[in-house]
Each structure stands twice: as structure tokens, then as C-alpha cells.
Amino acid sequence: MALSMPLNGLKEEDKEPLIELFVKAGSDGESIGNCPFSQRLFMILWLKGVVFSVSTVDLKRKPADLQNLAPGTHPPFITFNSEVKTDVNKIEEFLEEVLCPPKYLKLSPKHPESNTAGMDIFAKFSAYIKNSRPEANEALERGLLKTLQKLDEYLNSPLPDEIDENSMEDIKFSTRKFLDGDEMTLADCNLLPKLHIVKVVAKKYRNFDIPKEMTGIWRYLTNAYSRDEFTNTCPSDKEVEIAYSDVAKRLTK
């Protein structure tokens, strides 16, 4: 029977795991590229407070050692103590399970609704930005606005723990910073990278702005842009625009 011996007096469970994250590289082959799934995992690991390394992968010229490590796999993926994991949803579940309290933060939302808030936005945005028919533009824009409005309403609606049943004050609007409260959760790691893409690309290729009246969304984005976990894992606006230069269709009659 093999025994797992403690190293340097550390028990097995006390050792820091060896984690490497591989993300899509930008157009220069080195910087962070446009990939909401890469940013999602990058944010999760950062928020967990675990030590990890990040490598950008140039999809135009995959290095041979990467082909050997994860043949046929596109980033993002991770190696966790040398074990390769490639499915983003399963990686999220795995990290939440193994990087757990008391040593690491729990990132699952307390309110199930936070997981699904804004889930339709990216699909509506994709249909809007890929459309080339002027006569369809207005209806597709309305569809996008409707999903944004739904998210805005969720962000402005007080969560149960914002309401004090013993208080005489009637709280009509939420003041929370993120989807599930004042701290980021897995739900934010999923939605924020996509919402940022929508903001940047729709402005560049459709001159569309998220309406200022959507105060919940703007409060949400402003709070996200004040956090290193988001801004330091985010591709530059130029990278996002480059990524969509062939995807965004011109409206032609």
C-alpha cells in the first residue's frame, strides 16, 4: 500500500495545489485575448485567492508542448496538480468543490436567481450583431433591450437579505454591487465578461449604448470596473473590437 507522506511537515490537504490556467492570446500572440470563458476561469481563480500561473495561447501557432499537453483542445483549460481539465462548467464545479472554506472563499451565489440573471443577453446580442439586413435591425435591437431591461430590474430589486422585516423603512431599490450581493460570485464571473463584450462591440459596430436609464446595469458595471479581479483579467477594448471585426455584419440593403 502506497503512503502519502507529508512534505516539509505539511499535511497533504495543507499543500498549495499546482494550478496553471491556459487562456486565449490576443492578436499580438501574447496579451489576453477576447474570450469570456477564459476570463470566467481567470476571475474564479483570482477570487479564490489561490496561487496559480497563467499562460496565453496563440491559436495561430500552438506550441508543440501544448499540443502534447492537451491535444485538440482550445483554451481555456487548466492543469491542476498536472491533471488536465478542459470543460469550463466542470472546471468551475471542480474548483468550487476542492478550493473550499475555510482556506478558500465559497463563490456559489446564495440566491438561485442570480445564476440565471442575464442569461439570454449574449444570444440576443449575437443575433443583433451578426445581422446584415437593415429591416431586421430594429426588432433585433428591441430583443436585446428587453433582455437588458430584465437584468436591470433584477439588479434594482432588493434581495431578501437587503430587506429588514423589523424596519419601518420600505426598501424599493437595491444598492448591492453585484448580482448576489456586495461580493462577486460565480454568477458574476459568468455574466460580466459577456456583458462587457456587449457594451464594447454594440457601441463600435452599431453605435448602440446601454441606456443610461438602466441604472442597475450601470451600477453593476461601474462596480466591476473598480475591481482588479475583473479589470486585470479583461482583454482591452481594442482586442474585443478586433475579435468581432469579421463577426459583426454591416447593415447593407
Swiss-Prot record:
Sites of N6-acetyllysine modification: 24, 130
Residues annotated as domain GST C-terminal: 81-244
PTM sites of type Phosphotyrosine: 244
Topology with respect to the bilayer: Single-pass membrane protein
Positions where Phosphoserine occurs in the chain: 4, 132, 167, 236
Superkingdom as given in the UniProt entry: Eukaryota
GO MF assignments: chloride channel activity; oxidoreductase activity
Keyword Ion transport in record: yes
Entry keyword Oxidoreductase: yes
Signal peptide segment: none
Transmembrane segment boundaries: 37-57
GO cellular component terms, A-Z: anchoring junction; centrosome; chloride channel complex; cytoplasmic vesicle membrane; mitochondrion; nucleus; plasma membrane
First-level EC class: oxidoreductase
Pfam families, per database record: CLIC-like_N (PF22441), GST_C_2 (PF13410)
Compartmental location: Cytoplasm, Cytoskeleton, Microtubule organizing center, Centrosome; Cytoplasmic vesicle membrane; Nucleus; Cell membrane
Listed EC numbers: 1.8.-.-
Modified positions (N-acetylalanine) in chain numbering: 2
InterPro entries noted in UniProt: CLIC, CLIC_N, Glutathione-S-Trfase_C-like, Glutathione-S-Trfase_C_sf, Glutathione_S-Trfase, Thioredoxin-like_sf
PANTHER family with a match to the protein in the record: CHLORIDE INTRACELLULAR CHANNEL 4-RELATED, CHLORIDE INTRACELLULAR CHANNEL PROTEIN 6-RELATED
Entry note about domains: The active G-site contains a monothiol Cys-X-X-Ser motif which mediates glutathione-dependent redox catalysis.
Complexes and interactors: Monomer. Interacts with HRH3.
Family: Belongs to the chloride channel CLIC family.
Protein name as annotated: Chloride intracellular channel protein 4
